[in-house]
Amino acid sequence: MNHKKEKEYKKLDTEKLKENLTELQYNVTQRNATEKPFLNKYDKHFEDGIYVDIVSGEPLFLSIDKFNSGCGWPAFSKPISRKYIKERADFSHGMSRIEVRSKNADSHLGHVFNDGPIENGGMRYCINSASLKFIAKDKLKEEGYEEFLPLFEKDKQEL
């Protein structure tokens, strides 16, 4: 019998996080900070690949679901799979929003809004670049994410 073992994604302890992350990455993922709009790594980045949690490596978003929303942060129409994210109400700063976090590492990623392209489901996942690591499509196998290669096919399906 061939049982494929589910990959485990874990959060490092605080000391290791501070060693491995930049100050901005730490503040965004661990302290719910927001990076500056338009002055971040992935806002205008459209290479084929996946975006994973900078803390745990959890696969979060596909480049083919990324779009230019004009908001200044990377925007996606949907996550790779809902099993890798969690959403919760966020009433901070006098606003009512839905926060998006990674499921296992509990990293703050950004927020989701219902003003995305209608033809792609109407959602806009507005995500901080500092919470992400990009893995190019041609590096997915090498980095241990080969299971996501079929999602780049024309008739892709959500996991």
UniProtKB/Swiss-Prot annotation:
UniProt entry keywords in alphabetical sequence: Oxidoreductase
Superkingdom field: Bacteria
Domain MsrB: 14-137
Top enzyme class: oxidoreductase
Any single Gene Ontology cellular-component annotation: cytoplasm
Catalytic activity field: L-methionyl-[protein] + [thioredoxin]-disulfide + H2O = L-methionyl-(R)-S-oxide-[protein] + [thioredoxin]-dithiol
Active site, per annotation: 126
InterPro entries: Met_Sox_Rdtase_MsrB, Met_Sox_Rdtase_MsrB_dom, Mss4-like_sf
GO biological process, one term: protein repair
Entry annotated with the keyword Oxidoreductase: yes
GO molecular function: peptide-methionine (R)-S-oxide reductase activity
EC number: 1.8.4.12
Stated family: Belongs to the MsrB Met sulfoxide reductase family.
Protein name as annotated: Peptide methionine sulfoxide reductase MsrB
